[in-house]
Swiss-Prot record:
Organism annotation: Methanoregula boonei (strain DSM 21154 / JCM 14090 / 6A8)
Pfam families: CTP_transf_like
GO process annotations (BP): NAD biosynthetic process
Location(s), subcellular: Cytoplasm
Domain of life: Archaea
Assigned protein family: Belongs to the archaeal NMN adenylyltransferase family.
Reaction catalysis annotation: beta-nicotinamide D-ribonucleotide + ATP + H(+) = diphosphate + NAD(+)
GO molecular function, one term: ATP binding
Assigned EC number: 2.7.7.1
Name this protein carries in UniProt: Nicotinamide-nucleotide adenylyltransferase
InterPro entries: Cyt_trans-like, NMN_Atrans_arc, Rossmann-like_a/b/a_fold
Chief location of this protein within or outside the cell: cytoplasm
Length: 168
């Protein structure tokens, strides 16, 4: 059985993440999604709580034809220990999938097989761009799965982001 690990902040979960997971579902028997920086919320870079991100992901993946786990992963303040921390919080996995250079390096140094999936229209499908559009009042809904739009509206996420921006 091949179990893959895919980590991201998912602030918010978007169509680029969805495309990667659809691809991983073809090659993995199970997928572990690590919700990174789980302790962070209510900031411009991390407006959503770990629980809200878990909700976005689980609602968006209802049609994924692969069993998956969604596990919040808090940061540790020593990068050299991070891969071991992740392994202690997740089921065992064979491969880490990431395009983040630090994540790739840390898991490589920990002796884990690391593969970098292709990025899906990275210029548009990034949390930074989606949050920028939310703040600017520009359309963002087409960049995330419909289930994520619903969650963001349920939690009044755009207004939260705008209030945080005013406070800074």
């Amino acid at each position: 059985m091949k179990r893959g690990f895919y980590v991201g902040r998912f602030q918010p979960y978007h169509n680029g993440h969805q495309a990667v997971l659809s691809e991983l579902a073809r090659t993995c028997d199970e997928i572990i999604l690590g919700v990174g920086s789980a302790q962070l919320s209510h900031t411009l870079e991390n407006p959503f709580t770990a629980g809200e991100r878990v909700l976005m992901i689980t609602r968006a993946l209802t049609d994924l034809r692969c069993p998956y786990y969604v596990i919040p992963i808090e940061d540790v303040q020593r990068n050299a220990l991070w891969a071991a921390h992740v392994r202690s919080m997740t089921p065992p996995f064979d491969t880490c999938y990431s395009s983040n250079p630090l994540v790739v390096r840390l898991f490589f140094e920990a002796g884990v097989d690391v593969q970098s999936p292709a990025m899906y229209e990275r210029d548009r499908h990034s949390g930074t761009e989606i949050r920028r559009r939310m703040l600017a009042g520009e359309p963002w809904e087409n960049l995330v799965p419909p289930a994520v739009v619903t969650v963001v509206r349920e939690i009044d996420g755009v207004e939260r982001l705008r209030e945080i921006a005013r406070a800074d």
